[in-house]
Regions:
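Short beta-strand segments
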Residues: 22-24, 78-85, 126, 153-158, ...
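Histidine-centered active-site microenvironments of extracellular/periplasmic hydrolases
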Residues: 144, 148-192
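Structural scaffold positions in well-ordered secondary structure
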Residues: 13, 81, 136, 154, ...
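A long, amphipathic alpha-helix that forms part
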Residues: 61-71, 105-152
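Active-site-proximal alpha/beta segments of enzymes that process anionic O-linked groups
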Residues: 1-109, 116, 229
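Membrane-interface soluble catalytic domains
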Residues: 11, 28, 141-147, 191-298
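Short catalytic/ligand-binding loop motif for oxyanion handling, primarily in non-cytosolic enzymes
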Residues: 28-35, 86-93, 162-166, 185, ...
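A short beta-strand-to-alpha-helix junction
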Residues: 2-7, 119-131, 177-183, 194-210, ...
Length: 298
């Protein structure tokens, strides 16, 4: 993760003269984003302004607006804005955000167990999401006010979901399993000139770069030269699974089951509720996927 090599998208943007602005409500050195995907970005703010996620996220929007306003008219720009308030279950104690009640006033993870009522915890989470939605709206309003929205691609997503014991196996938060509750996230793209559409087939974050590089930056290389994903708009030939990576093991998430693989190559077959699956068929695609991934992990 700390190879010092930036992501291919950032490299391509810089080569084409884009102004780069990174604004985060959380530190960029945990994980070491400053040494990986954002390596080489000048004036990269490692630490956020403000005390706590609520303040830091608000400052991220403020700093984005100041930065964008400082650019020369007509400048091409790429911005990455990361909000931490949802991750921290935080929101301002104001009536417009305290919509979901009753909510858990003070989180104590030691109280979580399989019989714990998730409703107040989930209500707090939803309130924090409402705050994040408000910040996103501020960004969109700014772009519209500056007459930039009609010529700017906006991608809204999340790095992971959060579970509230959805499958009654005492899993809470994220990073504990590969169920939809923890890995399925929203993806909303505002793309001027594109017709509105709902995509029903399986996609992943790995598909974003192969979507942007050819259409926005004019990349003519075959997708496999730089990514294991594929364009989000392409349905033909799409895999019927997505690859998800964890700290100690990875997963191939299929429509009706989850295939886990650890560092030693041992497989475990689970259903979508994280219980043993009756289907223990070894997927034919696994050897090819592992071989393909090794090209990017040398």
């Amino acid at each position: 993760p700390s190879s010092g090599t930036p992501g291919i998208l950032l490299i391509a943007l810089q080569k084409r003269g884009y102004e780069i602005g990174i604004f985060a409500g959380a530190p960029l050195n945990m994980p070491e984003f400053h040494k990986s995907i954002f390596a080489g970005i000048s004036n990269l703010p490692i630490y956020p302004r403000g005390k706590g996620a609520v303040d830091s996220d608000a400052f991220a929007v403020e700093d984005f607006e100041k930065w964008q306003s400082s650019l020369k008219p007509g400048s091409r720009f790429f911005s990455f804005i990361f909000f931490d308030s949802v991750h921290a279950y935080s929101f301002p104690k104001e009536s417009k955000y305290e919509v979901f009640k009753p909510y858990w006033g003070s989180i104590n993870h030691m109280e979580l167990n399989n019989s714990f009522d998730p409703a107040p915890y989930l209500a707090r989470y939803k309130n924090s999401v409402r705050y994040a939605d408000n910040l996103i709206q501020k960004v969109l309003d700014y772009l519209e006010e500056k007459h930039l929205l009609d010529e700017t691609i906006v991608v809204i997503s999340s790095d992971h979901g959060d579970e509230f014991n959805d499958n009654k196996l005492n899993f809470w938060g994220h990073g504990g399993n590969f169920t939809d509750a923890q890995i399925k996230v929203p993806l909303v793209i505002h793309w001027p000139g594109k017709k509105p559409a709902n995509i029903e087939y399986m996609t992943s974050h790995l598909d974003l770069v192969p979507t942007l590089l050819p259409e926005v930056l004019g990349c003519e290389n075959p997708t496999e030269d730089y990514s294991v994903g594929m364009s989000i708009w392409k349905e033909a030939g799409r895999r019927n699974w997505v690859y998800s990576k964890g700290w100690s093991r990875d997963a191939f998430v299929e429509p009706n089951r989850i295939v886990l693989i650890n560092a030693a190559g041992a497989l475990e077959f689970l259903d979508k509720t994280y219980r043993p699956s009756k289907d223990k068929t070894i997927p034919a695609y696994i050897p090819e996927v592992l071989k393909e991934n090794s090209r990017y992990l040398k």
